[in-house]
Amino acid sequence: MAVSSIASIFAAEKSYSIPPVCQLLVSPVLNPLYDAKAESQIDAWCAEFLKLQPGSEKAVFVQESRLGLLAAYVYPTIPYEKIVPVGKFFASFFLADDILDSPEISSSDMRNVATAYKMVLKGRFDEATLPVKNPELLRQMKMLSEVLEELSLHVVDESGRFVDAMTRVLDMFEIESSWLRKQIIPNLDTYLWLREITSGVAPCFALIDGLLQLRLEERGVLDHPLIRKVEEIGTHHIALHNDLMSLRKEWATGNYLNAVPILASNRKCGLNEAIGKVASMLKDLEKDFARTKHEIISSGLAMKQGVMDYVNGIEVWMAGNVEWGWTSARYHGIGWIPPPEKSGTFQL
């Protein structure tokens, strides 16, 4: 599929509307311990990571993006000492994603950085520095290593689930970056296979287990088909909603690796019709989640220690991700004012 074929579908459409979704999930609740001090620490870390000048346009954008706020929405019960490390990790995830997608980074540098990040995840920082020659990337990699070391003090990951999930994300980032550079547009099924991993949801679900010290992996609970199903539903919901939110930003940079334009090209429909189909997919996922959650309760699986903490944690993640997507300026730009109804019309 060629990029030109996607661009031609939307040539006549200058605006699009996102309808309300997330109407069947639990209401999002902000962690009451998340305060201005925590947010300022995370913002300061982001500014140092990117070497931002105070008051610059990029610094204001990062500050209004409120990258640490996502942690407070999706982990509303964790204690204060865990909020900042998790917030920094989320921020590093977004910023590293931007770096790996940057045309200023050569494909060889990108491969070396992805390989180095995998070594950092396994605590092998000295080895990780060997393939990376760019001094700025080395500096950022050291900062990421420090964040992961701090995070490890608050997460139980004896099975290695979190590290394994992050490694898969980095593997798929390499594939995604290759597709972007070569302007390869996959079909919808192939894209959703990739997006399921590049969305980064798997390590974030692993953090539910690790931060709350549920030890579900060690006890074999995660192998149950119903648990696998709620994980799959949550992953697709988060990935698809993020694609709705990021469409305008990605469109402006010529990035067509998004469910909306790919679906439009596959189904031969316009932009707004494609958005309506994605919104309908989200609503179906929410209904499916409610049914599966009921099955977990009625089957007796909910009686196992930690199961409902995990299932409810996935639902909170889905709802919190929607809330943050409409609150943050990351997808909308400086001066963004969140609409109370979490829907709106946008200009391309």
UniProtKB/Swiss-Prot annotation:
The record's free-text note on cofactor binding: Binds 3 Mg(2+) ions per subunit.
Identify the residue span(s) of motif DDXXD motif. Answer: 97-101
Ligand binding (Mg(2+) 1): D97, D101
Entry keywords, A to Z: Lyase, Magnesium, Metal-binding
Q: Which GO terms describe its biological process?
A: terpenoid biosynthetic process
Coiled coil location: none
Superkingdom as given in the UniProt entry: Eukaryota
Q: What is its EC number?
A: 4.2.3.77, 4.2.3.-
- Give the catalytic activity: (2E,6E)-farnesyl diphosphate = (+)-germacrene D + diphosphate
Identify this protein by name.
(+)-germacrene D synthase
